[in-house]
Amino acid sequence: MIPSDFIDELLAKTDIVDIIDEQVPLKKGGANYMACCPFHKEKTPSFSVSPTKQFYHCFSCGAHGSAIGFVMEHQGLSFPEAVQFLADRVGMVVPKVHGQNDNPEVRAERKKKQQTLEETTAAAADFYAQQLKFNPAAKAYLDKRGLSAEVIAHYGLGYAPDGWQPLTQVFQPYPNTALVDTGMVIDNEGRHYDRFRHRIMFPIRNPRGQVIGFGGRVLDDSKPKYLNSPDTPLFDKGKNLYGLYEGRAAVKEAGRILVVEGYMDVVALAQFGVGYGVAALGTATTAEHVKILMRQADSIYFCFDGDSAGRKAAWRALENALPQLKDDKSLHFLFLPEEHDPDSYIRAYGKAQFEDALLNQSKPLSEYFWEHLSDGIHLNTQEGKAELVKTSSPLLAQITAPALAYLLKQRLSELVGIDPDNLAQLLGQEAPKRHVKQKNYKLPPISVKQPVMLTLVQRQIRSLLINPDWAAYIDLPDYLALDGDFACLANLAESIKNHAAVPETAQVLEYMRGSPYEETITRIFHSTHQSEEMNSSSEEDCENFQIGMKKLLNELKYSQIETLKQKSLQSGLNESEKKLLLSLLTAKQN
């Protein structure tokens, strides 16, 4: 059995939109993403994916679930296999449950600690955003950079006040363990002080929009120019990209994603209408970054300064990308004039010229690959040709995209003038092919059902699944006899309330997996055919939910009264039952 807190953390680090979009091309449709359902044949898209609730639902066949459920159904995997698949993607290790991992108290404590860390970074982000309003120098700096209030708010920019311990204004006691564990406060041999001081603050968010770390930029020319959060339980700089959450819609619209070097580049580009930029977090572009980028778009562009540092960073990105390359993905590299970075270039020339340079002057990976490797090599000599074969061989061996690998080797053959067959012998054994076990996937025999009218309690169950925080409005007394759908509603509410933080829909669905109520939930989703029914989260909807709970409670009490009356006539009541009946009748009269 895999611990529930691990499942929660896995779902928190997994974006269901990315998972499904790799298999089923999604298109933005209002707040959600839509596609033709992969689980039955249809011409009009009725398959909806919610990025906020992290679950999918088909309004025709009723298919629904979390990212785990989608992987299970679409790839034919078991629950443990699907969990392992998703864990591998985000760099998590599936725990072996034994010893203390079986202890619910240990799991609850670990989950509580995680929640405390998340609350700490969120509170710090709010504090920095508020401080920006009161610091003239910080506001003047952003005004000088031409950033609008809308862009500042979109990226949540803030200001870390000068001084050793400004976070004492919002955190008491100071320091505390969470401040140190999130990297907000430095512990220097017992002396504690804020990591970020007198800097413009850039909150770093995970795919769910939660603040997991920060980048801070100086307002002048002092060093270091950028200061980043260290790796923490929330934040791994090698597996996150700045601006990815904020730019997701722009990436979808443009069909491409752009990697730049600095946070300010990302924000400045967005100010000029290029909102699909992201930046690595104080490190070179890693293999994990490349995997993330390829999940976002088919076309990935890298934009670097034209100086030696920029070119070195570009080559490092290319090297880390080689094992991740796919034949249906393309990488491009743009080098700006040495006097410019993306921020200054787009300010000088505007969006149109910047995007023209990006699309028409950038070099595809295949061109940049040979240009870099042959730089300084005299290909008009035999020695130069031999050197190119030697330096390119280990790099070519890393490429598992079959068509691209073949074409690059063919180009090497042309550059050095060696027959492809002879060149293959020189290169040695070809890079091993990745043998992935393929499963013959067939559309499951799900028939599209006609709408079925749901009862009030079933509608309440659906509303609770969509809005888990509404569990606060459910209070069913212990003396009420609950079975069927009523028991399902009560169990759902109890499962939600038992967690320190309100879970999302995807997590609630996983709580119910394998429970006696899983079939009830499936039946309710199969009977939901209108998108409005899955987006009922307004204040009016919440009021209707509370009214519905009052009706259900009265219905249950009436049923309990009738049951007790019948028993009284047939076999009599014991003392506790008599008191309960009297209490219910009195309450009914009042």
From Swiss-Prot:
Domain Toprim intervals: 255-337
Gene Ontology terms: cellular component: cytoplasm; DNA-directed RNA polymerase complex; primosome complex
Binding site for Mg(2+) 2: D305, D307
Keyword Zinc-finger: yes
Keywords from the UniProt entry: DNA replication, DNA-binding, DNA-directed RNA polymerase, Magnesium, Metal-binding, Nucleotidyltransferase, Primosome, Transcription, Transferase, Zinc, Zinc-finger
Zinc finger (CHC2-type): 37-61
Cofactor note: Binds 1 zinc ion per monomer.
Pfam family, one: DnaB_bind
Listed transmembrane segments: none
SUPFAM superfamilies linked to this entry: DNA primase core, DNA primase DnaG, C-terminal domain, Zinc beta-ribbon
Gene3D superfamilies (UniProt xref): 3.40.1360.10, DNA primase, catalytic core, N-terminal domain, DNAb Helicase, Chain A, DnaG, RNA polymerase domain, helical bundle, Zinc finger, CHC2-type domain
GO molecular function ontology, one term from the record: zinc ion binding
Enzyme nomenclature, EC number: 2.7.7.101
Domain of life according to the entry: Bacteria
Reaction it catalyzes: ssDNA + n NTP = ssDNA/pppN(pN)n-1 hybrid + (n-1) diphosphate
GO biological process: DNA replication, synthesis of primer
Cofactor(s) it depends on: Zn(2+); Mg(2+)
Protein family per UniProt: Belongs to the DnaG primase family.
Quaternary structure and interacting proteins, as annotated: Monomer. Interacts with DnaB.
Record note on domains: Contains an N-terminal zinc-binding domain, a central core domain that contains the primase activity, and a C-terminal DnaB-binding domain.
Function text: RNA polymerase that catalyzes the synthesis of short RNA molecules used as primers for DNA polymerase during DNA replication.
Protein name per UniProt: DNA primase
Organism, as annotated: Neisseria meningitidis serogroup B (strain ATCC BAA-335 / MC58)
